[in-house]
């Protein structure tokens, strides 16, 4: 019953004349009066099966009751199609199967949506509710196959380079690493909780202290944070750590791994070494710490050209220590009306901009509401600074440098998509380096780690740790692909006194540091090697390599934007007996 000689999509003309056994699902059924045609589908593709009374009346009789998504066991002979019926859109389009027998292995109800990539758009909620049906679609299968191929390529590369695949705990200690932890109550230890790991960070460092030298793991991680299209509450990262390696060594090995992945999955050779860009340069030129370099429209600082202008918004921004930044949207002046530009201003306001000034370049000079403030040499300076030509649209934000960069960076991406400036066939990798070690929150009056508390400062900057910590640079590096952060890494602190000082900078008391990380600090007392590593988001990498725009399309059973599973209806309530065992009581909010 379960012997199979071919997958449906792999039968070629070489098999003509053979009797084959196939298994699969009914994609489509057509009754032409006397003959019935079925497209039989499995994970490899589709093959046409013909039920002909001259071949088997019993098979034809069974086929009359068959409907879409029935699971069939078919035996038949491979024959060549007549030339007029060849289907060039199918790999198997030059052959068909003359059915000699058919068994219905499983009947099926009419599915809530067509199992086809060409079907009318179906709401994502319906797809997620019936995920087992959605996964039958070829594009979904291909996304998960890409995930398998990427993982396989990563494992092969790391295995060949002397890394050991080591699992780290999933039930661990709650430590502050940025997002909220998912907590797991302990039945045995009343009132105490495990946390699901946000990353294996501390454990992989301890493995280096243990002398394992090269570690990797395809690691499941969990973060209870607000979701968006490229985030999931549970996600997978390619986690790597190495001893006695410099930042250069780790970056070199990481990009060689990515080159191997691209070669194995896409047959593409990427040029090494990958481009590098400083954090400061990325923010100032692209308005983003994960720049999309597939198109231009770079940010330009025009503060010098406008600081003495009569337009007070510009002049005062510069005088108050801010900046005037601009982008030149080449040839777009005619495409954007005043109403359109107002909408762009509203968009920029979402990123903190108080306004969006604009000018259009025409043959006889600059036009627009602020053009009167820029005549003669001032106009020439602005045109020259922005390389403006007839037909260009110039957009300006005058504000604190960070606000101007953020707003114009977001606007640049929006316009790049609207104007089809992005070559979707490109895979533009780059490194962002020279990160600040710390970020200062003026409202709270404290520092936060720009990456995490275990990142080593640049050695030359260690002398600033007690006097000017805000000036310290990190030995950190982020890998970016097409405007998405694939992941980041750093050289780690491996000296106890430096780690203690870092905890102090971040607001930990000595007691808090010992409570949270005492085991790590103690490990450093027993001879810790210099070490570092990187973690790359597998879900996001697969999303980009498979041409998807949503992480959920690269995960077999993902969560929604509200961190729920529509198929299993998780999370769900549990009964009181389970709560009692865990020494828990639900305190419900009173709704007003």
Swiss-Prot record:
NCBIfam families: aspS_bact (TIGR00459), PRK00476.1 (NF001750). It holds the Pfam family GAD. One of its GO terms (molecular function) is catalytic activity, acting on a protein. Its EC number is 6.1.1.12. Its main location: cytoplasm. L-aspartate binds at residues 177, 223, 451, 492. It catalyses: tRNA(Asp) + L-aspartate + ATP = L-aspartyl-tRNA(Asp) + AMP + diphosphate. One of its GO terms (biological process) is aspartyl-tRNA aminoacylation. ATP binds at residues 223-225, 232, 485, 537-540. Keywords: Aminoacyl-tRNA synthetase, ATP-binding, Cytoplasm, Ligase, Nucleotide-binding, Protein biosynthesis. It is found in: Cytoplasm. The keyword Kinase does not apply. Residues 201-204 are annotated as: Aspartate. GO terms for cellular component: cytoplasm. InterPro entries: Aa-tRNA-synt_II, aa-tRNA-synth_II, aa-tRNA-synth_II/BPL/LPL, Asp-tRNA-ligase_1, Asp-tRNA-ligase_1_N, Asp/Asn-tRNA-synth_IIb, AspRS_core, GAD-like_sf. Homodimer. CDD domains: AspRS_core, EcAspRS_like_N. This is Aspartate--tRNA ligase. It comes from Bacillus licheniformis (strain ATCC 14580 / DSM 13 / JCM 2505 / CCUG 7422 / NBRC 12200 / NCIMB 9375 / NCTC 10341 / NRRL NRS-1264 / Gibson 46). Catalyzes the attachment of L-aspartate to tRNA(Asp) in a two-step reaction: L-aspartate is first activated by ATP to form Asp-AMP and then transferred to the acceptor end of tRNA(Asp). Belongs to the class-II aminoacyl-tRNA synthetase family. Type 1 subfamily.
